[in-house]
Amino acid sequence: MRKIIHIDMDCYFAAVEMRDFPEYRGKPLAVGGSRERRGVISTCSYEARKFGVRSAMATSYAFKLCPNLILVPGRMQVYKEVSLHIREIFSRYTPLIEPLSLDEAYLDVSECQQYKGSATLIAEAIRRDILAETGLTASAGIAPVKFLAKVASDLNKPNGQYVITPEMLPEFVKTLSLRKIPGVGKVTAEKLTSLGLNTCGDVQVYSKQELLSRFGKLGAVLIERAHGIDGRGISIDRERKSVGVETTLAKDIYTLEQCQQVMPGLIQELALRLSRSAKDRKIHKQVVKLKFSDFKQTTIEHRTEEVSVNLFYDLLTQALARQDARGIRLVGISVGLADSTLYVASTLNTQTQLDLAL
């Protein structure tokens, strides 16, 4: 049986700000984009959460819920530096580290000999080191499999940890909500509920053939997770799957021409990001995303092995066909990265310059 720890920093961006600026402590604080530029909340303090403020919420709505909210723009470079320090702490206990983002990671400590191999004590030690060296608190989940470690890390927040032992696993998963399983979003959860499936226990006694017929690959995953099975190991060389850029507009726009005026800046920024982080990666698709005034969004993608500026404009036109008279508040573009090594950024740079020169 493996010993997996999921470490999740507590309201990370906001916590860094409160550490560096003590005047923010104990107050409702959020990191995110401004109301004037129609930004969204990246994260917020627990004091702000008491008012209902949440990540990914429109900043304007957050202020309606909490008029005294303190909003700061964020300092990404600082967050990255602290994250590297935290990752160095992880490496003292195991080389098997899978970062999920700046503020969370999986660790496999199955072979760790410290603390007599106790994953519970190792997690406590990691959290102590993080607090002592960075001034930040972390929560942890410990379990024999990845998805349950992630679930567990959320059960004793903030600054706590929760252990699911192999002996606890069968009973724990029976009552676990299907919404906690990665890959089960709002729409899928509603479909499952319509079938009378709300917990892993419900799936355990449901027809496997019916699940596979209705949900395909996700059905197979549901069957495994409902029985506490997750064969995924720690991916220490986890590759980036995509590179993208998007902009939230100061005011809603409505026409194709207005959207097209946004594109050159996005394309230039995408070219820059590709050259920095994926210059030796081959692409397999291009994507355009629009978010409308009702906060619903649509994406259009096309499989391709060569970046084409013209294709981005074609996809934009297709996406706009789904507008239904709604205003557009966000435009985004991205490329999906394949697992090969062909230089792609210079192509985009060249095409971008040609397009902008026309």
Swiss-Prot record:
Cofactor(s), names only, from the UniProt record: Mg(2+)
Membrane-spanning ranges: none
Domain of life: Bacteria
Binding of Mg(2+), residues: 8, 103
Co-factor: note: Binds 2 magnesium ions per subunit.
Catalytic reactions on record: DNA(n) + a 2'-deoxyribonucleoside 5'-triphosphate = DNA(n+1) + diphosphate
EC number(s) from the headed UniProt entry: 2.7.7.7
Keyword DNA repair: yes
GO cellular component annotations of the record: cytosol
Main location: cytoplasm
One GO molecular-function entry: damaged DNA binding
Subcellular localization, as worded in the UniProt entry: Cytoplasm
GO biological process: DNA-templated DNA replication; error-prone translesion synthesis; SOS response
Keyword Magnesium: yes
Active site: 104
UmuC domain residues: 4-185
Keywords attached to this entry: Cytoplasm, DNA damage, DNA repair, DNA replication, DNA-binding, DNA-directed DNA polymerase, Magnesium, Metal-binding, Mutator protein, Nucleotidyltransferase, Transferase
Family, similarity comment: Belongs to the DNA polymerase type-Y family.
Oligomer status and interactors: Monomer.
UniProt function note: Poorly processive, error-prone DNA polymerase involved in untargeted mutagenesis. Copies undamaged DNA at stalled replication forks, which arise in vivo from mismatched or misaligned primer ends. These misaligned primers can be extended by PolIV. Exhibits no 3'-5' exonuclease (proofreading) activity. May be involved in translesional synthesis, in conjunction with the beta clamp from PolIII.
NCBIfam families recorded: PRK02406.1 (NF002677)
Name of the protein this chain belongs to: DNA polymerase IV
Organism listed in the record: Shewanella sp. (strain W3-18-1)
Lineage: Bacteria, Pseudomonadati, Pseudomonadota, Gammaproteobacteria, Alteromonadales
